[in-house]
C-alpha cells in the first residue's frame, strides 16, 4: 500500500477511535447524572448535579484518569486523580475499575484503592473505604458486585467479594466475603439477612461489640480456671 494511503488509513483509524472515546465519555456522563437524579431526592436538575455534586465530579475525573492509566500514561493519571482528591475530598486510585451508574453520595472521606473493582449501579456514602489490610500482594482491594449499597463510614478491607444486591450497614467493617442478596452489619461485619430472610436479631442499632464479646470470653475463661484450681485443692 502507498505511504499516502497508509497515512490516510491511520488518520481515519485515529478519528474513529477518538469519536468512540468521546461518545463513550458522554454516554457514561449522562448515565451518571441520571443515576444521581434517581437516587438523590434532593437533586433538582442535571445542571445542578454536574456543577455542584462532588461525587459526580470525582467519578467523572476518575473515568478520565483511568483512560490515561490504561494507556500507561501514569503521571497524567495520578495528576488528575490528585486534582480530583483536592477538589472533592474523595480519593480514587486511577487504576480502580468502576462500572456504570456509580453514585457517591455526600462523598467526603471516600477512599477507593488501586485494585478495587466496582460493578454497576453501586452507591457508596461518605467515609467509605475500599482498602487493603496490608497483608496481601497483587489483588489487595475488594470486588463489589452490582446493585450494592455501602453505608457511611463502612470499611471493606482486603481482596474479598461483596455479592450482587447486598447492603453494608453504616460503620460496618467487612473482612470476609458477603454473599449476594445479603445485609451485613457490625464490627466485624456479620450477615443478618439473606435473600429476604432475617438470620438473627441483630440490626443497625444492636451492633455486636467486639470488645464486650472479648471481655465476656475472658471472664468465662477465668471462671473455668478458678474451678480447676479449686478442684485441685
Question: Language model features by range: what are they?
Answer:
Residues 1-88, 199-233:
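Terminal amphipathic alpha-helical/low-complexity segments used for targeting or macromolecular assembly
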Residues 85-192:
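Structural signal for interior beta-strand "rungs" in well-ordered beta-sheet cores
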Amino acid at each position: 500500500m502507498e505511504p499516502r494511503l497508509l497515512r490516510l488509513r491511520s488518520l481515519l483509524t485515529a478519528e474513529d477511535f477518538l469519536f468512540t472515546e468521546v461518545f463513550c465519555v458522554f454516554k457514561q456522563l449522562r448515565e451518571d447524572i441520571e443515576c444521581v437524579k434517581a437516587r438523590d431526592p434532593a437533586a433538582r436538575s442535571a445542571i445542578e448535579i454536574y456543577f455542584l455534586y462532588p461525587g459526580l465530579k470525582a467519578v467523572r475525573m476518575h473515568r478520565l484518569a483511568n483512560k490515561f492509566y490504561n494507556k500507561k500514561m501514569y503521571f497524567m493519571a495520578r495528576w488528575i486523580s490528585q486534582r480530583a482528591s483536592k477538589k472533592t475530598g474523595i480519593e480514587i486510585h486511577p487504576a480502580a475499575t468502576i462500572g456504570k451508574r456509580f453514585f457517591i453520595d455526600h462523598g467526603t472521606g471516600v477512599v477507593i484503592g488501586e485494585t478495587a473493582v466496582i460493578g454497576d449501579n453501586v452507591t457508596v456514602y461518605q467515609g467509605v473505604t475500599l482498602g487493603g489490610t496490608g497483608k496481601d500482594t497483587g489483588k489487595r482491594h475488594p470486588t463489589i458486585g452490582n446493585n450494592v449499597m455501602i453505608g457511611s463510614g463502612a470499611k471493606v478491607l482486603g481482596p474479598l467479594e461483596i455479592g450482587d444486591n447486598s447492603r453494608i450497614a453504616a460503620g460496618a467493617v467487612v473482612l470476609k466475603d458477603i454473599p449476594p442478596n445479603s445485609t451485613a452489619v457490625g464490627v466485624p461485619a456479620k450477615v443478618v439477612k439473606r435473600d429476604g430472610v432475617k438470620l438473627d436479631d441483630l440490626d443497625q442499632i444492636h451492633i455486636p461489640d467486639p470488645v464486650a464479646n472479648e471481655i465476656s470470653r475472658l471472664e468465662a475463661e477465668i471462671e473455668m480456671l478458678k474451678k480447676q484450681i479449686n478442684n485441685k485443692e
